[in-house]
Amino acid sequence: MTDNKYLTVTDLNYYITQKFKNDPYLHKVFLQGELSNFRYRRNSHQYFSLKDEKSKINVVMFRSYFDKVKFKPEEGMKVYVVGYVSVYGPQGSYQFYAENMEPAGLGALYEQLKQLQAKLAKEGLFNPEHKRKLPRFPDKIAVVTSASGAVIHDIMVTANRRFPHAEIDLFPAQVQGDTAADSLVKAMRQIAAQGDEYDVMIIGRGGGSLEDLWSFNEEEVVRQVYAMPMPVISSVGHETDTTLCDLVADARAATPTAAAEYATPNLADELAGIHQLQSRLIAGMQNNINQKRDRLNRIKNSVIMREPTRLYDQQIQQVDLLKQRLQNSIQNKVNNSLQNYRLLKQRLLSVSPDKQIAGMEQQEKFLAKQLNDNMKHYLKNKRSDFSKIVQQLDDYSPLKTLERGFVYTTNEEGETVSSVDQIKKDDHLNLHFKDGEVTATVTEVKK
């Protein structure tokens, strides 16, 4: 007998697994049943069973899928699950692999919630850029919750313990039931009507089922939270519960106590921080003073301080150098200016009227001298000529003639008589000799 016709257990399980995978009806199965053997495992995969009146099937829900479940599963709870069927090879058993789980009977609510969430998300109500920063030191805090629940008590106790300065004002509202949404909106509008009276608002309630928390998923409540003029902290249900108020609020707290902690600083921590900063500031200042003192001592003990004049040696030398440069520069400028002045003066003199006048004066003097010399020469010549003429005249002068013994005669009128025709008898005539005159009377005229 040969072994070839016998399958191994692994081969058989693999074959059956492939049958399950290739069956289109088992790829995505919608299953309803009652939770059985459910034991919550924190941060782990969940293993339980689903059963009805006649049958039971083992279920595995991996952590990545279970973290998305929006309610708290409990033993005996009827649920809707979606997943696929496959074989677990090591044990040779088939089981259901759940990918989604909802409480039975709440599917319509979940669908409504998803649709509203998608609508508001599309409008941008949940966008991070709309989230406002919580004030660090609030003066007044408004709280919207039930007046009779533990929420307001936890908030006031925590806030008074952490930051007694803050004033807590309750705006009571119904947090469950058909009229809860209207009551919540009315309370928030009362707060908004007071403008900037409040620094922050807390809205919340304790845990409950999806139906119990449904008023915090109503559209008018969510929009009013978004429209509040101050930052809003939402604390609705337990940590596993998430409402649309949580998504639209500026901050979400898992518990009322956590909400109060978000809203207020811890005064003791702040004082401790102040004291720490004060100590660091004093230490820093003291360290700075010590450093400055050490530096001052080093400066006081330096050679420069012991011989202060050395502090200015380089500066004095630099001043001397600059002074010499300045003097040289001034001298050069003066020399250049003088040279330019001389050149300009020479050029001016070359075209100056004074020089021309001086030349003309010089020429005048020369011409005057030449004229004077010429005049003297001319006069000398004329004197010589005059002397000759005088000599000639003197030679021909009547006086000379008189000296030779001749006389000349004038009548009584002083006219010279040169002819006997000018004389009559009894005329009185003056006879001029070289040394005198003689008056004579004509007694006779002869020719």
From Swiss-Prot:
GO MF terms on file? exodeoxyribonuclease VII activity; nucleic acid binding
Subcellular location(s): the record lists: Cytoplasm
Keyword Cytoplasm attached: yes
Keywords, A to Z?
Cytoplasm, Exonuclease, Hydrolase, Nuclease
- Could you give a single Gene Ontology term from the biological process aspect? DNA catabolic process
Query: Which InterPro entries does the record cross-reference, listed alphabetically?
Result: Exonuc_VII_L, Exonuc_VII_lsu_C, OB-fold_nuc-bd_dom
State any GO CC term.
cytoplasm
Keyword field contains Secreted: no
Residues making up the signal peptide according to the UniProt record = none
Q: What is its EC number?
A: 3.1.11.6
Q: Kindly report, in one word, the top-level EC class recorded for this enzyme.
A: hydrolase
User: Which reaction(s) does its UniProt entry say it catalyses?
Assistant: Exonucleolytic cleavage in either 5'- to 3'- or 3'- to 5'-direction to yield nucleoside 5'-phosphates
Q: Which Pfam families match?
A: Exonuc_VII_L, tRNA_anti_2
Q: Which family does it belong to?
A: Belongs to the XseA family.
Q: How does it assemble?
A: Heterooligomer composed of large and small subunits.
Q: Which HAMAP family match?
A: Exonuc_7_L
What the protein does?
Bidirectionally degrades single-stranded DNA into large acid-insoluble oligonucleotides, which are then degraded further into small acid-soluble oligonucleotides.
Quote the protein name from its UniProt record: Exodeoxyribonuclease 7 large subunit
Task: Report the source organism.
Answer: Lactobacillus helveticus (strain DPC 4571)
The root-end lineage is: Bacteria, Bacillati, Bacillota, Bacilli, Lactobacillales
Q: Which gene encodes it?
A: xseA
